[in-house]
């Protein structure tokens, strides 16, 4: 039985057919990376901006009238979102409180250096909810760019602030924002693994699963309601689909050997998975309820890490069929419908394919002086290295395709990082204590 070509990848993915000793080695790699203190109270991610884009858009967001009556500071969240994107520069409102219904002297805000201005209000309602209103202005043209009104519960205030930031982002930059999306990731503190779901800024983290065994490879369903992942709680890798609203789980694949690397089809009806049930790891398709297993590859190599293209017509995957791991593309119906074609040619070791939401770019990890995140233009094959770290893994595109979330190591710690696809905006997201890895960026909220 063939071994996987790199122990480093084995410790991250468990996609081959490891012996019991190899599985134990993979677990020890996690243990070595973890810090041994803190608990669930420290599940929130801390964000550090390490690079920003050029030509940042200056925006002033006044304090919303009445927001002191709400348990969330909406304007603080909005300002933080805009700053963290690297695309905006917050202009200090100097403590000004302005409602969306007020007459605004836009010229004075323009004189303060703001090209856009945001005003709003938060009003408690008689049934315990909150009415949130805002308006966005173009100070240069002296005109309104529109606004929205929301009636929400206390628990919805935070996501409402993210939605306001998304509105500002789209109106001013002409592309959809991702502040109201969610992240999934795995934390490791002591001997406890947790699958966590948080807002896009790493806050408001909720525990989906806690285990004393590793959890890897979370993958969001297209509607954002379910997460597929691999759990070792049965003392072997098993693929589950987890309903986030109910907490109910379905075993999607518990075949003999390894069950790993789940990837959703764009319609949310199927998953591609990697299984070693018949020997070498190969790619299969299975229905989201665990039925209808069908083999897609039949090579003598290791075929793993499948990823559907956004149009559902192709599956990208990693294979060593050429002697070393490279990324290939085949029809979504499998190699019986057409031979797989090699996609990556720069470098001798390329793994972990992820396709941008528009299908134009491929993010992957290349071994070149370490493991580095790369971005390939699928139209011409041009490749750009996006990071200066050397332990990158698990890339995941934001829903708008403008940012990539990945795991890496900084200062000896396992952290998450995000980089814009132009390489200019960079963030590091870390836990107060413990290791964090296996990130997946969720889709636009339905």
From Swiss-Prot:
One GO CC term on file: periplasmic space
Keywords: Cell cycle, Cell division, Periplasm, Signal
Gene3D superfamilies, per database record: TolB, C-terminal domain, TolB, N-terminal domain
Compartments where found: Periplasm
GO biological process terms held by the UniProt record: cell division; protein import
Annotated signal sequence range: 1-43
Any one Pfam family match given in the protein's UniProt record, by short name: PD40
Residue stretches spanning the membrane: none
Function as written in the Swiss-Prot or TrEMBL entry: Part of the Tol-Pal system, which plays a role in outer membrane invagination during cell division and is important for maintaining outer membrane integrity.
Membership in a protein family: Belongs to the TolB family.
Subunit structure: The Tol-Pal system is composed of five core proteins: the inner membrane proteins TolA, TolQ and TolR, the periplasmic protein TolB and the outer membrane protein Pal. They form a network linking the inner and outer membranes and the peptidoglycan layer.
Protein name as it appears in the record: Tol-Pal system protein TolB
Organism classification: Bacteria, Pseudomonadati, Pseudomonadota, Betaproteobacteria, Burkholderiales
């Amino acid at each position: 039985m063939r071994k996987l070509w790199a122990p480093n990848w084995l410790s991250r993915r468990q996609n081959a057919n490891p012996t019991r000793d190899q599985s134990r080695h993979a677990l020890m790699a996690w243990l070595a990376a973890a810090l041994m203190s803190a608990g669930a109270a420290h599940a929130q991610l801390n964000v550090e901006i390490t690079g920003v884009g050029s030509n940042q858009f200056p925006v002033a967001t006044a304090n919303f009238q009445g927001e002191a009556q709400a348990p969330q500071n909406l304007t603080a969240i909005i300002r933080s979102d805009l700053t963290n994107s690297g695309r905006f520069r917050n202009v200090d409102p100097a403590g000004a409180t302005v409602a969306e219904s007020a007459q605004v002297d836009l010229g004075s805000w323009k004189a303060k250096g703001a090209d856009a201005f945001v005003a709003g209000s938060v009003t408690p309602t008689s049934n315990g909810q909150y009415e949130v209103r805002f308006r966005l202005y173009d100070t240069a043209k002296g005109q309104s760019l529109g606004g929205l009104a929301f009636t929400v519960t206390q628990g919805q205030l935070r996501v409402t602030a993210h939605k306001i930031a998304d509105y500002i982002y789209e109106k001013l930059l002409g592309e959809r924002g991702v502040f109201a999306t969610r992240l999934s990731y795995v934390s490791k503190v002591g001997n406890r693994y947790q699958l966590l779901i948080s807002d896009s800024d790493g806050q408001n983290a909720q525990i989906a699963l806690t285990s004393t065994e590793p959890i890897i490879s979370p993958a969001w369903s297209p509607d954002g309601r379910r997460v597929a992942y691999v759990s070792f709680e049965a003392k072997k890798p098993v693929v589950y689909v987890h309903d986030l609203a109910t907490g109910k789980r379905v075993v999607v694949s518990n075949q003999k050997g390894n069950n790993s690397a789940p990837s959703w089809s764009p319609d949310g009806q199927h998953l591609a998975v990697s299984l070693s049930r018949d020997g070498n790891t190969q790619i299969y398709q299975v229905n989201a309820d665990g039925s209808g297993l069908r083999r897609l590859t039949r090579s003598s190599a290791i075929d793993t890490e499948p990823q559907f293209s956004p149009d559902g017509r192709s599956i990208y995957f990693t294979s060593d069929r050429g002697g070393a791991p490279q990324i290939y593309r085949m029809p979504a119906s499998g190699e019986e419908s057409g031979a797989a074609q090699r996609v990556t040619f720069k470098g001798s070791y390329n793994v972990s394919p992820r396709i941008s939401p528009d299908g134009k770019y491929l993010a992957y990890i290349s071994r070149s002086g370490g493991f580095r995140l790369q971005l390939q233009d699928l139209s011409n094959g041009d490749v750009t290295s996006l990071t200066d770290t050397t332990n990158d893994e698990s890339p995941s595109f934001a829903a708008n395709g403008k940012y990539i979330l990945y795991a890496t190591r900084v200062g000896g710690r396992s952290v998450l990082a995000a980089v814009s696809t132009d390489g200019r905006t960079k963030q590091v997201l870390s836990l107060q204590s413990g290791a964090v890895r296996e990130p997946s960026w969720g889709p636009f909220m339905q």
